[in-house]
């Protein structure tokens, strides 16, 4: 049975895309069929997987969602890009910002992405959705389409403070739109474990959320080298410097 996981945080720069890529590659290496969906108009996931100019793509997530909004038949085989590491990618580009506006007046507006995801379940073991850094309609669509939500959070005060709003939104989606959604867990990223500040942040997360939400023991350390290689486009090096143990908790 396919499992759909949203990688979500309204704060940017907390390793959502890095987590999505690493999780996807890890699952592929365990023999799973994986589709990753870029649901961010910035197209960071698409670029991380080698799409240099996602804005030039004729078919991407925005065009698929527009077809669904207009109640047109969608060929689910179109637009999927197969990556050399075994992942399939549904890319995204800046046009998703326009879709976000279109959704305001759309019928069943929270379920547009779910319509696409449901059509893909039979082909994959896992579908991972890299959410945009906001709590707008596209993110609500991503949560409505998912079975689980995975929350990377930077080991710093402001990102942790923003968790409350994110978790409230997820519970509202669960109550009104998607009763099946569950927390996969919180993954602490960009951690400098040598500082007392980072340790205090970790304890704060455990204190407020540890009883209700799983917190992964694996953590992504802060790495200057990883940040530099990511900025330079060295995707392989970035993956090698990131946590690779998270998939051990995936069923």
Task: Go through each PLM region and give its residues.
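P-loop NTP-binding core
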Residues: 1-239, 246-249
